[in-house]
Design a protein with these regions (language model features):
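A short, solvent-exposed loop/turn motif at the edges and junctions
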Residues: 46, 72-82
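Short strand-edge motifs at loop-to-beta-strand transitions and within beta-strands
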Residues: 59, 90-92
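Hydrophobic beta-strand segments
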Residues: 42-46, 70, 108
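Short Pro-Gly-centered beta-turn/loop motif in secreted/extracellular proteins
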Residues: 37-39, 60-67
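Short, acidic Ser/Thr/Gly-rich low-complexity loop/linker segments typical of extracellular
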Residues: 49-58
Length: 404
């Protein structure tokens, strides 16, 4: 995490998508638990493309392939294959059942967590891609002042990744299409920059960028413990919890690592930065702020997902959430801000050439907001897969559009 990507905190709203045909077929719906609660971040796959459900549990999947079924999965639930009729037009309501833990699975609680993680690290070259690949993605940044959205930026992004056993880091990201929207009110904007941006899947790909977490020295700073196993899709997962065991010059994390029981591939990480030392947390989170503004970190949480497909485990989704307070000196009250960045991989292709070169590449010092245009076209994402905006975000976009 020492590498940093700057993203202006005032932007918010980015979507990731994959290029489809001129008139893509689409299916939409909402994913629920068996108890009727909406499931956020559920994975929906079909026709060679993938999307995730938004904060309302809603999704729209577009593809130019013949779509006869979709597969829906979520951590802790059994995956469900939903058959589609040729004339499927109405939104689906998909209910997932909680995965049951069998008796023999409880025995994994006695396993050695540190040895398990070490074994998973040793299998990275085998479990992950051994050839260069081009990923098609949708990226979204949002920023909120208190409970109100003040910025949205989103775009279609291509991401080139070399093989996971490749020694040089030549991974790159390029923006193919994007848009932005910023509150015109003077009091809404604050030029604070925090770590983030479209290169998050490169910098936070913990399986490939092992220097910030998955190495023997760094893991030595943590207590590792086995937790109750769970499932992702229909695959059983070991769950390893981690917490700091000593004070270090840099902040550490609390969190969980999910490891596939069959392949020993890392499939998911849920991490939260230790906020006990506010100065260290600030140094990790903050890139730039105006003189006289006091920055007070509250939360930095990360979610990193990988998906097994055709025998290869690939990165599939990344989300970061920042919460912090800012105030000017001599002012009585601080203002709460929330910034969220998320990127979903909607498709990928094998490639023998480097498709992103030179000026196309998004630099870690760039701000995504400065690279895209303002919201204008009402059907901007017509042919792309994206993370559908929630109802509250849609209302915020409409409100900000009226103020322009």
């Amino acid at each position: 995490m020492e590498r940093r990507i700057t993203t202006i905190i005032l932007l918010v709203l980015l979507g990731i998508t994959t290029v489809c045909a001129q008139q893509p077929k689409q299916v939409s719906g909402t994913v629920y638990s068996a108890a009727g609660h909406v499931l956020v971040g559920a994975s929906v796959t079909g026709g060679g493309h993938t999307v995730v459900t938004n904060g309302d549990g809603y999704f729209v999947l577009k593809t130019d392939a013949e779509l006869t079924s979709i597969t829906v999965s979520h951590v802790g639930y059994r995956a469900q294959r939903v058959k589609l009729s040729p004339a499927q037009n109405e939104p689906l309501r998909v209910y997932l059942k909680t995965a049951t833990i069998q008796l023999q699975e409880v025995l994994v609680m006695s396993a050695n967590a540190r040895e398990l993680v070490a074994a998973a690290i040793s299998k990275i070259p085998k479990n992950y891609s051994q050839q260069p690949e081009l990923f098609h993605c949708f990226y979204r940044e949002t920023a909120q002042k208190r409970n109100h959205y003040i910025m949205v930026a989103e775009g279609v992004v291509d991401m080139y990744k070399t093989a996971y056993d490749y020694q040089r880091n030549d991974d790159r990201v390029a923006i193919r299409k994007g848009r932005r929207l910023l509150s015109p009110r003077k009091g809404d904007t604050l030029s604070v920059k925090v770590t983030g941006g479209p290169v998050l899947p490169i910098q936070l790909d913990m399986v490939k960028q092992r220097d910030w977490l998955l190495n023997e020295e760094e893991l030595g700073y943590y207590h590792l413990e086995m937790e109750m196993p769970t499932t992702i899709g229909d695959r059983q997962q070991y769950v390893v919890s981690m917490r700091p065991r000593r004070k270090m010059p840099h902040p550490l994390y609390f969190g969980r690592l999910y490891i596939d029981q069959e392949t020993l591939a890392f499939t998911r990480a849920e991490l939260s930065l230790d906020m006990s030392d506010r100065l260290k947390a600030t140094q990790m989170m903050l890139v730039k702020k105006p003189l006289g503004v006091r920055f007070r970190p509250k939360e930095l949480s990360l979610q990193i997902d990988y998906r097994l497909e055709d025998g290869v485990t690939r990165i599939s989704y990344i989300r970061t959430l920042f919460r912090f307070n800012c105030d000017w000196r001599r002012r009585l009250f601080a203002t709460a801000f929330t910034a969220c960045c998320e990127m979903v991989v909607t498709g990928q292709d094998a490639t023998t050439e480097r498709p992103i070169r030179g000026r196309e590449s998004f630099d870690q010092r760039d701000a995504f907001f400065d690279k895209v245009d303002y919201f204008l076209d009402p059907v901007f994402w017509q042919e792309y897969n994206i993370i559908e905006p929630t109802e509250s975000l849609n209302r915020a976009i409409a409100r900000l559009m009226k103020r322009r």
